[in-house]
């Protein structure tokens, strides 16, 4: 009986395997942080890309090098990520003498992991307005 108590006390006081258990408990948290940072990086990258595409498209239209319909196709093709194409609108306001390019994307389509589920039903929109140059 004393020998059994001694073995039980040694087992309970021993630290063997404790690191493995702690690691197993922390793995989901570490993976969630990794996936969350990857999702945020993808969103920031897409937003930066959409700003550049909108600015470039507005500049081309403001110089009268494209019509609004041509500019929408141009921007949509450049904004495509894999198989996903965001919504692109080009509006020329003759009275205000401006062109506005708007790119709207579903954030869930841009985030590869969406660990938190926050991207469902949310959109990211980028809008650039530029003055039309005189003809």
Residues of each region from the PLM?
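Alpha-helical assembly-interface signal, strongest on the long, hydrophobic N-terminal helix that forms
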Residues: 2-75
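Short, conserved structural patches
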Residues: 2, 55, 59-135
């Amino acid at each position: 009986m004393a020998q059994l108590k001694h073995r039980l006390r040694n087992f309970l006081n021993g630290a063997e395997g404790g690191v493995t258990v702690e690691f197993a408990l922390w793995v989901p948290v570490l993976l969630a942080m990794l996936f969350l940072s990857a999702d945020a990086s993808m969103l920031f990258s897409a937003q930066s890309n959409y700003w550049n595409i909108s600015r470039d498209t507005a500049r081309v239209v403001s110089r009268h090098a494209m019509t609004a319909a041509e500019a929408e196709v141009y921007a949509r093709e450049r904004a495509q990520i894999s198989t996903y194409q965001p919504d692109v609108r080009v509006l020329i306001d003759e009275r205000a003498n401006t062109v506005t390019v708007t790119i709207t994307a579903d954030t869930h389509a841009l985030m590869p992991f969406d660990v938190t589920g926050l991207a469902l039903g949310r959109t990211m929109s980028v809008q650039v307005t530029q003055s039309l140059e005189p003809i």
